[in-house]
C-alpha cells in the first residue's frame, strides 16, 4: 500500500537538492532511519526536534508549521497543519476522485497540489516541486 501511495525517500532528491534550504522533519513517527539515509546518501541534514512531541503537542507543532517558509509533503497529517496555519504547502499526490480533494477546502488556500497517475513514477512530481520552490525561494521570509 505505501509504495503505491507514498514515494520512497530516494524520490525526494530533487527537493533535497535545492541549494540554501533548511529542512525540518514534521513527521510524528520515528523516521530516524530515513533521516539518516538522507544524510548519508545526499549529505543533507533534516532537522528533527527531539524535545517536540509531534504526536501530542499539536499547538507547538502548529507553531512550528507557521514558522516555516514552505512545506513539502504527501497527503499526510502535517499537510493539514501547514495548510491550516497558512504556510504555503506543496503536496505530492496521486490523482484521485474530487470528493476528497483538499483543494475544495477553503482552509487550504495555501496548497499547491502536484499530482501523478497512481502507477507513474514520482520523479516528475518532485522535479516540478523543486522547480516551483526554486522560483519562489528568494521571496521567503528568512531571519
Where are these regions (language model features)?
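Catalytic machinery of carbohydrate-active enzymes
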Residues: 1-143
Amino acid at each position: 500500500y505505501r509504495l503505491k501511495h507514498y514515494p520512497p525517500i530516494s524520490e525526494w532528491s530533487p527537493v533535497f537538492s535545492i541549494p540554501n534550504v533548511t529542512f525540518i522533519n514534521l513527521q510524528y513517527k520515528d523516521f530516524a532511519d530515513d533521516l539518516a539515509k538522507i544524510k548519508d546518501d545526499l549529505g543533507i541534514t533534516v532537522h528533527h526536534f527531539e524535545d517536540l512531541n509531534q504526536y501530542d503537542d499539536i499547538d507547538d507543532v502548529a507553531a512550528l508549521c507557521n514558522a516555516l517558509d514552505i512545506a513539502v509533503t504527501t497527503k499526510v497529517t502535517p499537510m493539514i497543519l501547514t495548510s491550516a496555519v497558512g504556510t504555503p504547502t506543496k503536496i505530492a499526490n496521486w490523482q484521485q476522485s474530487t470528493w476528497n480533494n483538499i483543494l475544495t477546502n477553503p482552509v487550504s488556500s495555501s496548497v499547491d497540489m502536484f499530482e501523478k497517475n497512481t502507477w507513474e513514477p514520482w520523479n516528475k512530481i518532485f522535479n516540478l516541486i523543486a522547480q516551483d520552490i526554486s522560483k519562489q525561494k528568494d521571496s521567503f521570509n528568512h531571519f
